Amino acid sequence: MKIAIDFDDTLATYEVQRLADMLIKSEHDVHIVTSRVSNEHAQNPRWNDDLFLIAEMLSIPKEKIHFCNLTPKWKFFCDNDDFDFHIDDDAEEVDEINQHSKTKAFHFVSTFDNSGIRRIANKIENN
């Protein structure tokens, strides 16, 4: 399956990094789709160093990192309609993606006991 994961407050968290690692090891095609601006549009050319560091740590290549440059993510998923799932901490983005695109978006909420991430992992594996 082709799976997108938001970065800020999502893949930036350890629990989602563990999920991404599991998905990659299970041979899912994992991408990063972020609202952030790319380095070309950022005021600081090192703006995305944290993102690139985590992507490298997870072996997610740069060509699988998609910057939406502050436009709504649902537009990205309408233009790139081959994604099966997207995981995001922004409930509004999740609702818009589910409303306007074929991609099934899941709302990630960090929990003390990791139950939220286990619920998402189970939904992905059972589809």
Where are the model-predicted features located?
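Alpha-helical substrate-recognition element adjacent to the catalytic core
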Residues: 1-71
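C-terminal cap/substrate-recognition subdomain and adjoining C-terminal extension
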Residues: 44-127
